[in-house]
Amino acid sequence: MQSWSRVYCTLAKRGHFNRIAHGLQGVSAVPLRTYADQPIDADVTVIGSGPGGYVAAIKAAQLGFKTVCIEKNETLGGTCLNVGCIPSKALLNNSHYYHMAHGKDFASRGIEMSEVRLNLEKMMEQKSNAVKALTGGIAHLFKQNKVVRVNGYGKITGKNQVTATKADGSTEVINTKNILIATGSEVTPFPGITIDEDTVVSSTGALSLKKVPEKMVVIGAGVIGVELGSVWQRLGADVTAVELLGHVGGIGIDMEVSKNFQRILQKQGFKFKLNTKVIGATKKSDGNIDVSIEAASGGKAEVITCDVLLVCIGRRPFTQNLGLEELGIELDPRGRIPVNTRFQTKIPNIYAIGDVVAGPMLAHKAEDEGIICVEGMAGGAVHIDYNCVPSVIYTHPEVAWVGKSEEQLKEEGIEYKVGKFPFAANSRAKTNADTDGMVKILGQKSTDRVLGAHIIGPGAGEMINEAALALEYGASCEDIARVCHAHPTLSEAFREANLAASFGKAINF
């Protein structure tokens, strides 16, 4: 549990931020800049309006800083809102409904439908409307918080200067006390394979296909690969994912959960070729694509033919033409911007957060860094425990985890205990006829402290936040087990798993 000294410290910091906010000058009332000869003066200039950038800009303005946010695209929100998290979740949700209606699921619930048809155009329209509403929402929040928005490509042209260049070549200069780089990431290209966003697509193109592929090959069975692959598999495509690693779900996933996840996806019709590498891809005259693969350890090559090839081998930091070289800021071997614990680069008033720095490329991680970074600019404490940052795969069932996996605990030599509870024994999952998966809790053997939580099943993405809170506050498995959970709810499975971890036995299993 949180100590009283930590509570007092937190309250003191809040008071410190309030005093700073009242002491600073008011922010600009101009929500959108047009291009002019007169430079803008700012306290904080944020380059990029993705989850990290726009949240940091709003927080900076709320703390009393005169804040500018530069965005090269017409809409705010970055990759996440425009061609990432948000549109993909719309398609994941709606394709799941279609799959339930088109298969035997609805019939088993007493819902009989004579004909179920897919209107892909309408599904894409709903996705686009969700994106439009949310990106417009950020613009409204900027106006509400008096964040000055500048359209253009931001480049750092001096220690205290950023120049935004518009598509027509016109420029705007911002003289600023602090600069925050939040330019995000871009799709990692596959050597020898050219993405045309038509038949050879990245995650961006996979969100806007004009028709359901007959056969789709996905290079990579990590988070993005299985999410987008499952969308098109549910809508009727024959989908095969080729993965260099020996498991699905990417780095960080617990291996027991990964095996269960693969089994469930295969039961749904998703195919996998693990421990397999892609050698190349060739477009044929009939429009199809031959994908050459072989075992990761080497061996005889095999060819898989598809009409759509989806490349999902990860993302890389986007730092092109930011002016870093001229400032003497060198990137690390993975193309990331080195920063200290306060997110400062080697130039103290130039900061970087999100996908351009080390750590998982997650929207919520970038948001946290953005808030804490600008609080640091205002003189506050800066601390993030990356062990408490959750990860979610938004398939059905969902997969989510936070903290350590069994593999990590074994590698670190930490003695631990395990508590599990299957959704098949959860009353709400039973009534919903959605019982695949389990909750798995890892606790420290000597102290009972929660070290990790791994969930596969309905509502995993929502439930994992309870685990993140427990980790952040240093809760024990018993602490969670003694919290009364509403009945009947899926989250009772989380309590039961903690009962199993702390006392050696769950109640309902």
UniProtKB/Swiss-Prot annotation:
FAD binds at residues 71-80, 89, 154, 183-185, 355, 361-364. GO terms for cellular component: acrosomal vesicle; mitochondrial matrix; mitochondrion; motile cilium; nucleus; oxoglutarate dehydrogenase complex. Disulfide bonds join C80-C85. The active site is at H487 (proton acceptor). Keywords: Acetylation, Cell projection, Cilium, Cytoplasmic vesicle, Disulfide bond, FAD, Flagellum, Flavoprotein, Mitochondrion, NAD, Nucleus, Oxidoreductase, Phosphoprotein, Redox-active center, Transit peptide. The active site is a redox-active disulfide bond. This is Dihydrolipoyl dehydrogenase, mitochondrial. It comes from Sus scrofa.
